[in-house]
């Protein structure tokens, strides 16, 4: 029965998206340990705790931090995770891995939630604190890699300032099609379906000195971004990926600041030059995309499920 259900699900995905899930049967053997010194290929340390306090990890001992930070006010994570938290709390190893309370902690959660008195400044301060702690733990020239997307340029500037303030530099971005095309809150909308993996490298105070921004530097970054966009669109449309205008703008923002490095923070005059040029580029992003097909509203299983309820026409 399990196999037949799995095959049926795979066929549904194949019919709708012309793709199929592949299961290789590999298993993961892992026995959690409590002491960081005992970590090896089969013995991880599992913790459920505040990422601003990683005292159990020795400084400059980690090659790379891979994470997925909360997206501002997009999702109330702690409230949603309680469904799973209560089961983890009942686990035989609950106390060992940090599930010491029956529901998830919410007081210190890094999120934008006006009801809880948490504004955007609180969110940015929290993200910066986490990135700063990561900077302490990664080795010299180590990496911080995380996924991010946001329609707001202000949100991008906030996350970039957190990156730089913590002692990292954005080196590269990798667009990745999201696991699901849409959710209940983004169906039938001009939403973002492309995640961006931002690769940031640890820098020292003496390395990578800031350069005075000139119009030529900004134009070169724009040109690099344009070439990257065209190349990315070509790759994604070969597999029939959907692109909305916000998708393309997000890729452009990430690649632009990757090309620019830390320079845009050098002074307010330079910052104004950078942002004004970037905004013009973003406003004309459909012209940059040219003949590539741009999706006006996201399709997906939620859209199909609620099509009749919402009286959505094809």
Model-derived segments and spans:
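Long, compositionally biased intrinsically disordered regions
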Residues: 223-314
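SAM-dependent methyltransferase catalytic-core segment centered on the flexible catalytic loop
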Residues: 46, 51-55, 60-140
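Flexible, glycine/threonine-enriched loop-and-boundary segments that flank and lead into catalytic domains
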Residues: 14-66, 123-125, 129-130, 143-149, ...
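Segments forming glycine/polar-rich beta-alpha architectures that bind adenosine-containing cofactors
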Residues: 41-66, 71, 287-314
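A structural signal for short secondary-structure junctions
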Residues: 38-41, 137-140, 188-193
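Hydrophobic alpha-helix feature that most strongly marks membrane-spanning transmembrane helices
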Residues: 70-71, 85-92, 132-139, 143, ...
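Flexible, glycine-/basic-rich loop-and-beta segments that form/coincide
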Residues: 183-184, 188-236
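Single conserved hydrophobic/aromatic residue that forms the stacking wall/gate
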Residues: 1-15
